[in-house]
Amino acid sequence: MDPDHQLASLARDIEVERVRGGVKAAEDRRAICRTRSRIDRGRDPRELVIAQGSPAIVGHSHNIDSTRLDFDLTSEQQSIRKLAKDFADKEIAPGARERDRNETFPKEVLRKMAPLGLLGGPVPEKYGGIGIDYVSHALVTEEVGRADSSVRTTLSVQISLVEMTILKFGTEEQKQRWLPRLCKGEVIGCFGLTEPEVGSDATKIRTSAKRDGDSWVLRGRKTWISNGSVSGLALVFAQADPSKEDKGITAFVLERDRQPYGSQALHGKLGLRSSDSSELILEDVRVPDANRLGEVGQGFKIAMSALDSGRYSVAAGAVGVAQACIDASVTYATTRKTFGKPIAGHQLVTELIADMVVETEAARLLVWRAGDLKDKGRPNTRETSIAKLYASEAAQRAADNAIQIHGGYGFSDEFPVERYWRDARVNRLYEGTTQIQKLIIGRFATGIDAIG
């Protein structure tokens, strides 16, 4: 059978499996737990294949060690995607508009996500997670982002910034102490790095940490902290030795019921209105040294590692927004009629949709490439920044095109595309702005650090 017929046959098989409904939720959960980092090598007509024998792609210090790239999903990964999609369609998307209008934090959605393991996906089972691989994590994040970026933001902070950072840098006692509660949704976590006067240049944070016996006393303010006012646990960065600059920054985990920190919710945001954004207020908060994450002076390294993880999640969520724009635009363009035919029959409208599809597919593959490297334990900062940059920009363009296709209706929240546009905008800001991503990518290309 020639390749085209093989692909067509596989496409039919996948569609039949989709219509059958896949596996039940309990079977999905068992499938998730089995996934780990396995990557089968089947064929999927939607994904990129570089034929065997074609030249390898070469980048600065990132030679690809294979002449064949294959981004197929395993059956387990397909089950994970279906589980996340079904949950997003049933439990997240229906209430997104009202949550956005009322700035309502999605605590009920999170409560329903926890039993499915979606609050601790890539965390190993022994710490309360379900141990899925990074590509699977991207699939879940994309589907959640497709339904509601506010929920996706909450999830990204909980998993990528807080859980995965504790997993990577915490002691065994710290992992056992905090991760199960986070994965079960018993406590919401936040990540306290940004300050009123300090954003991209995190080496200049002013929050102080002064040693006092077996404790530290933290003083300062953080701002634009997602999950801040709803959090029961905060991963906070403070300067323990200003003379050492970034080498003095140290990380601490604060439990609000034991190390009471203050918070003040921020309102009037352009987008992500149902996610929580807050100031954190640290007024001589006493923190045991046992709550220090990593070594003294290791905080900046920990923060950069966490942001790298967060960028991956933001990129996957941005793909979800772009896909939502495509879905809404196709539905509208094939039903709305002008001049006696659906507007999809007008070439300039079709061009807008085609542009959206191309950029979304490209962004998705960039995310999967970064995830594949993460699963293999290989360096991926460059690839993650590329994915974050491209996906966030593509999502904004897709949302803009979607509004154009919807015309006047796109300017009203009776249709979701205006929310997609507002929510997409922040992807170009947090976890490193578009400009910061370009500086990182440029450093890998030239070997020269233009940041400072």
What is each PLM-predicted segment?
Residues 34, 51-157, 169-174, 181-186, ...:
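Alpha-helical interface subdomain recognition
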Residues 1, 14-19, 23, 32, ...:
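Hydrophobic alpha-helical signal/anchor motif
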Residues 155, 182, 197-200, 224-227, ...:
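Short Gly/Pro-enriched turn/cap motifs at secondary-structure boundaries
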Residues 185-193:
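A short, Trp-centered hydrophobic/proline-enriched beta-strand micro-motif
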Residues 284-302:
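Long, acidic (Asp/Glu-rich), low-complexity accessory segments flanking structured domains
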Residues 204, 257-286:
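Flexible, small-/acidic-enriched active-site or ligand-binding loops
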Residues 215, 219-263:
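A short core secondary-structure module
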Residues 2-5, 13, 28, 40, ...:
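Intrinsic-disorder-associated, low-complexity terminal segments enriched in Asp/Asn/His/Tyr and depleted
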